[in-house]
Amino acid sequence: VVAQSGSNYNELLGQRGPNVITTAVPFISISPDARGGSMGECGVATETDVYSMHYNPAKYTFMKDRMSIGLGYSPWLRNLVDDMNLAYLAFAYKLNNESAIAATLRYFNCGEITYTDEYGTSHGEFRPNEWAVDVAYSRMLTDYLSGSVAGRFIYSNLTQNLVDGSSVGWSVAADVAVYY
């Protein structure tokens, strides 16, 4: 008896070859504050604070203080690499009881990396980095519902043009958020 299948033998064994993760600027998803990070990234469900831009900027209209400033520093993956870190600066200001503005600056330093070719020849050392600037406006829509619009500029310099065909990357993004 011969059985035939359309599957590749390696796929039947669960081996499909390299599975490269191609997430662009993954530093954007790292929680900037110790509280949110220690609670499993659940900052969406917490009380409004200056770090709300990362979770939902529509929360800013529910801020208790008129103005907040926050500064955060996280040594990232310290057990693996000793010089990779995330720095975060946040500012939020309630214009009145119904609206607020906020801005953040996020800087991610990948540490010092030695670039080599396929033969192991060194092509210099470099400190790859990425950063993003966010600006948001939030407005109360009802007593329990608010909305916001936010814009973001993203900069990524991971290779310093040391890799053929590579260049600095940058992008802009916009978000619309609702909070109930």
Segment roles from a protein language model:
Residues 4-180:
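Subset of outer-membrane beta-barrel
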